[in-house]
UniProtKB/Swiss-Prot annotation:
Homodimer. It comes from Escherichia coli (strain K12). Reduction of a variety of nitroaromatic compounds using NADH (and to lesser extent NADPH) as source of reducing equivalents; two electrons are transferred. Capable of reducing nitrofurazone, quinones and the anti-tumor agent CB1954 (5-(aziridin-1-yl)-2,4-dinitrobenzamide). The reduction of CB1954 results in the generation of cytotoxic species. It comes from the Bacteria. This is Oxygen-insensitive NAD(P)H nitroreductase. CDD domains: NfsB-like (cd02149).
């Protein structure tokens, strides 16, 4: 299936079939998608919680209480549930972790190339954390890049998913001790196979026309 067909076919799943699980291979593939998403300057300011056990999914679903109870069954019935978390502050320890990993992966021919790469990343990191004072917002944007990449990727694997912002982040952060670890939850994405109750699976896709959303120059 070509990428345009995938984009046209995927939809936000409103109900999952709890009896259908990801295969072990698919479970590994979705983790690879998370790992290899693009991010600004390859900063990767994220962490993911992947819940596949009933206990794990129930812990995530605690955040779908009160005003968000309509999302609870999605979290409980999906095969896997991914919590996308962003770093709350960019620090030099993380930047060193990134450049050292790039070095270990063979991206630099010389020490000078590594130093230049590190300097360039720190320029943008410092611009956001010291000049614009919006590093938290900048890092959240990178996580959303990952979410978009992930949604298209899981659809290409023949899986169904739905991005959820309707959850109590304070409850979820507390449940997993995210604040203490320097993260906060942004998006929850259940993944699995839609059920016959998923009304959205049979509805036509609707988007604004290109003459409204696109300008060619």
């Amino acid at each position: 299936m070509d990428i345009i067909s995938v984009a046209l076919k995927r939809h936000s799943t409103k109900a999952f079939d709890a009896s259908k699980k990801l295969t072990p291979e698919q479970a590994e593939q979705i983790k690879t998608l998370l790992q290899y998403s693009p991010s600004s300057t390859n900063s990767q300011p994220w962490h993911f919680i992947v819940a596949s056990t009933e206990e794990g999914k129930a812990r995530v679903a605690k955040s779908a209480a009160g005003n968000y109870v309509f999302n609870e069954r999605k979290m409980l019935d999906a095969s896997h549930v991914v919590v996308f978390c962003a770093k709350t502050a960019m620090d030099d320890v993380w930047l060193k972790l990134v450049v050292d990993q790039e070095d270990a992966d063979g991206r630099f021919a010389t020490p000078e190339a590594k130093a230049a790469n590190d300097k360039g990343r720190k320029f943008f990191a410092d611009m956001h954390r010291k000049d614009l004072h919006d590093d938290a917002e900048w890092m959240a944007k990178q996580v959303y890049l990952n979410v978009g990449n992930f949604l298209l990727g899981v659809a290409a694997l023949g899986l169904d998913a739905v991005p959820i912002e309707g959850f109590d982040a304070a409850i979820l952060d507390a449940e997993f001790g995210l604040k203490e670890k320097g993260y906060t939850s942004l998006v929850v994405v259940p993944v699995g196979h839609h059920s016959v109750e998923d009304f959205n699976a049979t509805l036509p896709k609707s988007r604004l026309p290109q003459n409204i959303t696109l300008t060619e120059v």
